[in-house]
Protein backbone atom coordinates (compact mmCIF):
# COMPACT_ATOMS: atom_id res chain seq x y z
CA UNK A 1 0.00 0.00 0.00
CA UNK A 2 2.78 2.41 0.81
CA UNK A 3 4.36 1.78 -2.62
CA UNK A 4 1.05 2.60 -4.29
CA UNK A 5 0.82 5.84 -2.27
CA UNK A 6 4.31 6.88 -3.39
CA UNK A 7 3.45 6.14 -7.02
CA UNK A 8 0.26 8.20 -6.71
CA UNK A 9 2.21 11.10 -5.17
CA UNK A 10 4.78 10.91 -7.97
CA UNK A 11 2.04 10.90 -10.60
CA UNK A 12 0.37 13.94 -9.01
CA UNK A 13 3.73 15.72 -8.92
CA UNK A 14 4.30 14.88 -12.59
CA UNK A 15 0.84 16.19 -13.53
CA UNK A 16 1.47 19.38 -11.55
CA UNK A 17 4.68 19.89 -13.53
CA UNK A 18 2.84 19.33 -16.82
CA UNK A 19 0.22 21.90 -15.81
CA UNK A 20 2.90 24.41 -14.82
CA UNK A 21 4.62 23.97 -18.19
CA UNK A 22 1.25 24.36 -19.93
CA UNK A 23 0.68 27.68 -18.11
CA UNK A 24 4.09 28.99 -19.15
CA UNK A 25 3.76 27.81 -22.76
CA UNK A 26 0.22 29.13 -23.11
CA UNK A 27 1.43 32.58 -22.00
CA UNK A 28 4.23 32.51 -24.57
CA UNK A 29 1.85 31.46 -27.34
CA UNK A 30 -0.66 34.25 -26.90
CA UNK A 31 2.12 36.82 -26.52
CA UNK A 32 3.70 35.64 -29.78
CA UNK A 33 0.31 35.77 -31.50
CA UNK A 34 -0.09 39.36 -30.35
CA UNK A 35 3.44 40.27 -31.43
CA UNK A 36 2.97 38.68 -34.87
CA UNK A 37 -0.27 40.57 -35.45
CA UNK A 38 1.28 43.85 -34.22
CA UNK A 39 4.23 43.39 -36.58
CA UNK A 40 2.47 41.98 -39.64
CA UNK A 41 -1.04 43.44 -39.53
CA UNK A 42 -1.36 46.47 -37.25
CA UNK A 43 -0.27 47.39 -33.75
CA UNK A 44 -3.51 49.31 -33.19
CA UNK A 45 -5.66 46.27 -33.91
CA UNK A 46 -4.36 44.40 -30.87
CA UNK A 47 -4.20 47.28 -28.38
CA UNK A 48 -6.30 46.24 -25.42
CA UNK A 49 -7.96 43.28 -27.13
CA UNK A 50 -9.40 40.43 -25.13
CA UNK A 51 -7.94 36.98 -25.49
CA UNK A 52 -11.12 35.99 -27.36
CA UNK A 53 -10.51 38.74 -29.92
CA UNK A 54 -6.81 37.89 -30.15
CA UNK A 55 -7.59 34.24 -30.89
CA UNK A 56 -10.22 35.29 -33.44
CA UNK A 57 -7.63 37.48 -35.20
CA UNK A 58 -5.09 34.66 -34.99
CA UNK A 59 -7.54 32.24 -36.59
CA UNK A 60 -8.42 34.78 -39.32
CA UNK A 61 -4.71 35.11 -40.09
CA UNK A 62 -4.22 31.32 -40.04
CA UNK A 63 -1.86 31.35 -37.07
CA UNK A 64 -4.15 28.87 -35.31
CA UNK A 65 -6.62 26.35 -36.67
CA UNK A 66 -9.30 26.07 -34.01
CA UNK A 67 -10.53 29.19 -32.22
CA UNK A 68 -12.75 27.21 -29.82
CA UNK A 69 -9.87 24.97 -28.82
CA UNK A 70 -7.75 28.02 -27.91
CA UNK A 71 -10.64 29.41 -25.86
CA UNK A 72 -10.66 26.10 -23.98
CA UNK A 73 -6.91 26.52 -23.30
CA UNK A 74 -7.63 30.05 -22.08
CA UNK A 75 -10.28 28.70 -19.71
CA UNK A 76 -7.88 26.00 -18.47
CA UNK A 77 -5.17 28.58 -17.86
CA UNK A 78 -7.51 30.81 -15.86
CA UNK A 79 -8.95 27.98 -13.77
CA UNK A 80 -5.51 26.54 -13.05
CA UNK A 81 -4.45 29.87 -11.53
CA UNK A 82 -7.39 30.34 -9.22
CA UNK A 83 -8.38 26.88 -8.05
CA UNK A 84 -6.68 23.80 -6.87
CA UNK A 85 -8.60 20.65 -6.36
CA UNK A 86 -7.83 17.26 -7.80
CA UNK A 87 -10.83 17.11 -10.15
CA UNK A 88 -10.08 20.46 -11.76
CA UNK A 89 -6.37 19.64 -11.88
CA UNK A 90 -7.20 16.41 -13.73
CA UNK A 91 -9.43 18.30 -16.18
CA UNK A 92 -6.71 20.88 -16.85
CA UNK A 93 -4.15 18.08 -17.23
CA UNK A 94 -6.31 16.37 -19.88
CA UNK A 95 -6.65 19.68 -21.76
CA UNK A 96 -2.87 20.16 -21.69
CA UNK A 97 -2.47 16.89 -23.56
CA UNK A 98 -4.41 18.41 -26.49
CA UNK A 99 -2.60 21.72 -26.13
CA UNK A 100 0.79 20.19 -26.96
CA UNK A 101 -0.23 19.52 -30.57
CA UNK A 102 -1.90 22.93 -30.96
CA UNK A 103 1.18 24.73 -29.62
CA UNK A 104 3.46 22.76 -31.96
CA UNK A 105 1.16 23.58 -34.88
CA UNK A 106 1.21 27.27 -33.94
CA UNK A 107 5.03 27.22 -33.76
CA UNK A 108 5.21 25.60 -37.20
CA UNK A 109 2.90 28.24 -38.66
CA UNK A 110 5.01 31.02 -37.13
CA UNK A 111 8.20 29.50 -38.52
CA UNK A 112 6.69 29.21 -42.03
CA UNK A 113 5.58 32.84 -41.95
CA UNK A 114 8.86 34.22 -40.63
CA UNK A 115 11.23 32.76 -43.20
Give the location of each predicted region:
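Solvent-exposed interaction patches of small proteins and small membrane subunits
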Residues: 1-115
Amino acid sequence: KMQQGVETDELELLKAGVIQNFEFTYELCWKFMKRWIETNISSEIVDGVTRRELFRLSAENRLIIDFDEWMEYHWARNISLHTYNSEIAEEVYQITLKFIKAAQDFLGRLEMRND
